[in-house]
Amino acid sequence: MPVPILLVTGFLGAGKTTVVNHLLAHAEGRRIAAVVNDFGAINIDAELIAGASDGVVSLSNGCICCSLEGDLLRTLALLLRRDPQPEVIVIETSGVADPLDIVRNLMDPIIWREAPLETVLCVVDATVPVAMLDDALLRSQEIGRAHV
């Protein structure tokens, strides 16, 4: 049975890790695997995930939209081989990621068959106008392409 993927995106400090923590805290018995990407050498976001366990996989020192895309696909393949298999895979992107590139990578036919991308959730800090961000065009596109 396919395992749906929820892709959580958003700019730096928008609250992505808070959203992932909320999902994990309210899993109600569902097996949720979380893949957390942090651009830095130390994955601070993975350390902040409440109750971080073997259900949380850290990908750091690069971005899953480009330099770590192969690592992401390998990680997903490993998660799908676990017994018991997760019921949902949540991927938290780094704040500098271009989600369009990640979506393209997740459309790999082998991955898609076993773990289709179900939802792209873009977390936005409503107190920070998008126009004030250094990469306003990218962030506007990110918001526009999200399902939620």
Regions found by a protein language model. Give the residues of each.
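Nucleotide-state-sensitive switch-loop elements of NTP-binding domains
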Residues: 2-9, 14, 18-138
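A short, aliphatic-rich alpha-helical micro-motif
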Residues: 83, 143-144
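Conserved small/polar residues in nucleotide/adenosyl-binding loops
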Residues: 146-148
